[in-house]
Amino acid sequence: MSYEDYQYNETLTQEDCWTVISSFFEETSLARQQLFSFDEFVQNTMQEIVDDDSTLTLDQYAQHTGAQGDVTRRYEINFGQIYLSRPTMTEADGSTTTMFPQEARLRNLTYSSPLYVDMRKKVMVAADSNVPIGEEEWLVEEEDEEPSKVFIGKIPIMLRSTFCILNGVSDSELYDLNECPYDQGGYFIINGSEKVIIAQERSAANIVQVFKKAAPSPIAYVAEIRSALERGSRLISSMQIKLMARNTENSGQTIRATLPYIRSDIPIVIVFRALGVVPDRDILEHICYDPNDFQMLEMMKPCIEEAFVIQDKDIALDYIGKRGSTTGVTREKRLRYAHDILQKELLPHITTMEGFETRKAFFLGYMIHRMLLCALERREPDDRDHFGKKRLDLAGPLLASLFRMLFRKMTRDVYKYMQKCVETNREFNLTLAVKSNIITNGLRYSLATGNWGDQKRSMVNRVGVSQVLNRYTFASTLSHLRRTNTPIGRDGKLAKPRQLHNTHWGMVCPAETPEGQACGLVKNLSLMSYVSVGSPSAPIIEFLEEWGLETLEDYNPSASPNATKVFVNGVWLGVHRDPAHLTETLRSLRRRLDISAEVSIVRDIREKELRLFTDAGRICRPLFIVDNNPNSERRGELCIRKEHIQQLIEDKDRYDIDPEQRFGWTALVSSGLIEYLDAEEEETVMIAMSPEDLEASRQMQAGYEVKEELDPAQRVKPAPNPHVHAWTHCEIHPAMILGILASIIPFPDHNQSPRNTYQSAMGKQAMGVYLTNYQVRMDTMANILYYPQKPLATTRSMEYLKFRELPAGQNAIVAILCYSGYNQEDSIIMNQASIDRGLFRSIFYRTYTDQEKKIGMTVMEEFERPVRSTTLRMKHGTYDKLEDDGLIAPGTRVSGEDIIIGKTAPIPLDHEELGQRTQLHAKRDVSTPLRSTESGIVDQVMVTTNQEGLKFVKVRMRSTRIPQIGDKFASRHGQKGTIGMTYRHEDMPFSAQGIVPDIIINPHAIPSRMTVAHLVECQLSKVSALSGFEGDATPFTDVTVEAVSKLLRSHGFQSRGFEVMYHGHTGRKLVAQVFLGPTYYQRLKHLVDDKIHARARGPVQILTRQPVEGRSRDGGLRFGEMERDCQISHGCSSVLRERLFDCSDAYRVIVCDICGLIAIASYKKDSYECRSCQNRTRFSQVYLPYAAKLLFQELMSMNIAPRLFTKNHK
């Protein structure tokens, strides 16, 4: 077999890479990070939270009254195992049934599961009640044999997670349940609306970061760490170590530490002495590992001099205790207080237990060491925006913090109940003790409103954590499930956190971010990125101890200054002598899945550190592993080979084998062919861009001269870097750096970058089919395109976004041409004949909801057809279309302000109703009218009951929206435009074959925007329409314009897509040739019918009597400050007076000529008076804006007299 054949067979082709990507998406959905995180919460975290607070103890001390039964008792309640069942609902009559998601949506219920916990109570008696507290011996008096299962609340369930009814259900069964098989889940249903939890980005805890402070600050450098326990509360204790700047009086730069609960900064030498490291030499050893590093030792000089006075552990503790929050206590207590703070609050992530002072001292020394390295300029200060130092809190951690808070609240209530029972000698009932609605309502409140945390302290909570799931287009739904948010103030003009960072490569989409104030703060995950759910660190620590880790207690820095420090989740565990071997071993264990695949192993050779992370919220992405075993004959090639790809393809369609045995994505990971790397570990590896590049580089290493034949049309590729000797990983495909919406863009690599960002925003507003079950859903609003088409120019990624199955647009024939001038400034001309044949026609659904509410115990509202004789306050729309039950029949045509749900509420007997009420009027009208601007046909009426068993209706209305002048359209390249004119078929230009374009856009839209991909897409679509194959417009592939042109030429067309066209009016040949071809266009949701608005007269605000604002309230158009300034600059004073006064809030005021204040006037009787002046004759009439009159009267109420004096103009 010659070398050529071998090479051909072995190098992975692009096609093979896509096979691997397909296997990835077959195994996991696009909402996987949401589902994994929620499953971890339900299966592990919830039980851990219960175990953390598992015992309630109440001691009842003997009263020493000598009476019988006067003994010291201890009551204990234990929480044990928790149980979560499938989602259920309790009807108003008390029956319990299984709940399905569709039912929850339609009946406005919450899709949640009941949570039970084993509770066990125990009463113990002290053997002798005269012993001091804390030394009693307890004898069990009574104990429950069996723990009782108690209902403690309902947990909302994420759709398609392990506990959801739809989990593992086949497509045909989904149809029976009225669910769409394309729906990915990953959201909750709260009160009938779909809520998604947006991932919250935060800085990682437990990592040391060093920053340089700007010039005027008294601090030169600061090292900070925010500690949090590995699991347990989010109570973060932060600590800083500051290197003071050189000031004039004392030239030395001292180092101080900020300790929690201590008011002033403490010199670090004192902190070391308080931790029990007393001699100067020992302190220096903790900080400076190399005794010959005189520069660093010199930096420490001022610190040691500063703390020279304090030479003893107790004195150091006292020094710290004196600066604590407690004052005027005994020395004994101060020492205890300082000791407790050092034990529990200083670096709590290392441990909060007794006897670990050595570890804390070493860690403190490490922090100072890091800071001094920066100060000596041997190391760069840290980068705040490094993505490896960020964590994403998904549904799991967010719900966990909420659940922990609510569970504690509930146990406090149980404790109070227990106290009450013990005091009053009542029987203690576990079911009564637990208030189950604390957890139920707490979780529901946070998910429903997005205010994360306690309902009572809603000001301090995070807002917008949960949002209503965007159901406009299928792609917008997917994108919403993968969105992340950075909670820093939107108004801050900080540019740094918003910028794209190198470490974002492959983790978040570079194009998909909103424009405006949230730009760069709201991000979207890339297609293949994965968020770690967290795994316990104990097994790794155990393994390290077996593999020769020297603990800090035995570590002598001066003896081995070159040992590598080992950190696990930010905790310095010890040092190791052979880091290379250790790293290699850990990696091979991870590739065999002996330790979790999401653990990251970062070996920093220069700083001599090995950092391991197992925590939740790190963002990782998969990469091919390159074989780097020195003994292997395939060194420098990918571990994954053709036979693996072959096996993937074979097993893909085999349904007869068990899913566990199938060779899929998981098998690739467990066979060590692919591994997940996070942003931190990515910096320690070398990644080739594609298997071809890897192969080219390998041949270069082997000494083959690769002669490139120069093709001028070929895509320019950088030559392989001769200095790279070994690659460790290889990208699966560079197209995977994009997110959901950017993956829909054809050739995004040929566009100017902001254009891709604009399209990513507009793709969310395109009409299409958002789900296949839209007929059975009652969404508030929905737009469905009549004839959606799959695009002719597709990307490979669309396969996984189901864009072919649920597209959002149509392939229109587009000519780029100036024609008549009705397509200037981004407007487009559309062919009326195409519109009449159904191009871009869409249907619009809107749902109106109402229910009979209870008012008090007995009285309730009622659906009926209101009658004018017995009902007050009836609306002015027509009630004729209602049936007797107060609802409208499906199929009825309705227009603005018709009543579609008739409902009345009883009037209490004592209400006067502004004197309109007579004996007959017993009810008032609370009906729902159609929106004033809409019209259509009633599509569906649903009558059901809600949770309380009250009658509840939803009425869905539909109307057809036909494209018309003013509607907005866009191609997939940020080229948006509105229809400027529709021409009849006979007025449009036509080509030699008689092809008439559907859309004509202006050539001026192309040059300045540089959307070359728009033109390439048009050309490629033309080829694929002629050849009958989909055109592949995936980014970063070798498709060139030249290749497409050749194909177009072979079909007998001009190679660049130009065609001769004839003028529609005259039939003459157009002078220039016209670029003509199919382009995929999207109809956006901004329709002129929903925006058109004008007003002559209408409602005014009560307070200022100026017109109200807003189209829905029939408001006026604001004539603002800038408009006013223009009129002033033109000198049009009468126009100004008319706009701002006559047409707004003109008002007639009578003013007393003596005092200049507003007088009492009765226009009917023609009598005026000013009582303070006893004036009845001398008045002036003034016209004022009502707002000015209001201002004057408000000033009068504050004892300021605005006096209006008038002149008589003869």
From Swiss-Prot:
Binding sites annotated in the UniProt record for Mg(2+): 826
Biological process, per Gene Ontology: siRNA-mediated pericentric heterochromatin formation; transcription by RNA polymerase II; transcription initiation at RNA polymerase II promoter
Binding site for Zn(2+): 1152, 1155, 1170, 1173
Catalytic activity field: RNA(n) + a ribonucleoside 5'-triphosphate = RNA(n+1) + diphosphate
SUPFAM superfamilies: beta and beta-prime subunits of DNA dependent RNA-polymerase
Zinc among keywords: yes
Keyword 4Fe-4S: no
Xref: PROSITE patterns: RNA_POL_BETA
Zinc finger (C4-type): 1152-1173
This enzyme's EC code(s): 2.7.7.6
PANTHER family: DNA-DIRECTED RNA POLYMERASE I SUBUNIT 2
Family: Belongs to the RNA polymerase beta chain family.
Name listed for the protein in its UniProt record: DNA-directed RNA polymerase II subunit RPB2
